[in-house]
A protein has these predicted regions:
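A membrane-cytosol interface segment of integral membrane proteins
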Residues: 242-275
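Loop-to-helix transition at the N-terminal end of transmembrane alpha-helices
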Residues: 15-19, 42-55
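Membrane-interfacial helical/loop segments at transmembrane boundaries in membrane proteins
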Residues: 1-4, 77-82
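Membrane-embedded catalytic scaffold of the fatty acid hydroxylase/desaturase
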Residues: 53-64, 68, 83, 89-243
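Short, strongly hydrophobic alpha-helical membrane anchors
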Residues: 1-13
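Membrane-helix interface motif
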Residues: 66-78
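Membrane-interface helix-loop junction between the first two transmembrane segments
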Residues: 28-47
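Hydrophobic core of alpha-helical transmembrane segments in multi-pass integral membrane proteins
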Residues: 19-29
Length: 275
């Protein structure tokens, strides 16, 4: 465990970029070989839009990274945060508790709030407009949402009292998890269900991308599935019934044109339909 801590304490930016690219490339190949759905779409054009948004997220996160670093350093120096108040324990348990709490505050909580607060939903719905969810969809976030999520990540680091090595570890796991859960891949049903008791599985997250309520407002988890089960936001829908997108933006010109996607948060919002 000490070696892992040492690695993430000094992980180069090049390694983080390599993990991002390698993950997308790996799942891209797998979903071509074993697709969950056979989409009739221009895969490269679709990927281009999502990769553009991924790049804007990377730029925003790198530009604001010093805030995250300063927050973590302050928490450690001032013995502030949940982890700093816990008694001595094994490093493995310390890391697990920290990752769970970062996942709760920096991912699950912000995701739920984005669905409940109309102003934040304006930005987050861009992620849901994708009717061809694949591994490139994982970081399909409007730049405005990237700033919102960064703010909650910083809040999570402060409340948890997380050292930076743990933040980098969480972000690395999160990247791979996001690519995995969005990938258009087929897993054996029993395996997917088994995984969903511990982590967010592909089919579990695909339910969240169903185009209509109440399924859109379920399965908010990022890495760990415990939060959806604990807070009653877990839902199941057979994959055969899943239709991707958001019911108010199902037309191709709505969800497959970059210019329009960037403008949607500032346009008059359309009322959702409830089944």
């Amino acid at each position: 465990m000490n070696e892992i801590v040492s690695y993430f304490s000094t992980i180069p930016s090049s390694h983080r970029s390599l993990i991002l690219v390698a993950g997308i490339s790996f799942f891209w190949l797998i979903e071509n070989a074993f697709p969950l759905f056979n989409f009739n779409y221009k895969k490269w054009q679709h990927a281009g839009i999502n990769i553009f948004m991924t790049l804007t997220t990377i730029i925003i996160n790198f530009s604001l990274a010093f805030i995250l670093l300063k927050t973590s350093d302050w928490a450690i120096a001032n013995n502030f945060g949940v982890l700093q108040w816990l008694p001595q324990m094994s490093l493995w348990l310390y890391a697990l508790i920290g990752l769970l709490l970062l996942d709760l505050i920096g991912a699950y909580l912000v995701h739920l709030i984005e669905h409940k607060v109309k102003f934040l939903w304006r930005f987050h719905l861009i992620h849901h407009t994708d009717t061809w969810v694949d591994t490139t969809s994982g970081n399909r976030h409007h730049p405005g949402e990237s700033v919102i999520r960064f703010a909650f990540t910083t809040l999570g680091v402060l409340i948890v009292g997380s050292p930076m090595w743990m933040v980098f570890m969480y972000q690395t796991i999160s990247i791979v998890s996001t690519q995995f859960t969005h990938a258009n891949i087929t897993l054996p049903k029993r395996l997917d269900i088994f995984l969903s008791y511990f982590i967010v599985s592909p089919n579990m997250h695909k339910v969240h991308h169903h185009f209509m309520l109440p399924y859109t407002d379920s399965n908010y988890g990022n890495i760990f599935s415990v939060w959806d089960r604990l807070f009653g936001t877990f839902m199941y829908l057979p994959k055969e019934k899943i239709v991707y997108g958001i019911d108010t933006y199902m037309e191709t010109q709505d969800h497959n044109q970059l210019n329009n996607l960037l403008k949607i948060p500032f346009q008059k919002q359309r009322s959702p339909k409830n089944n």
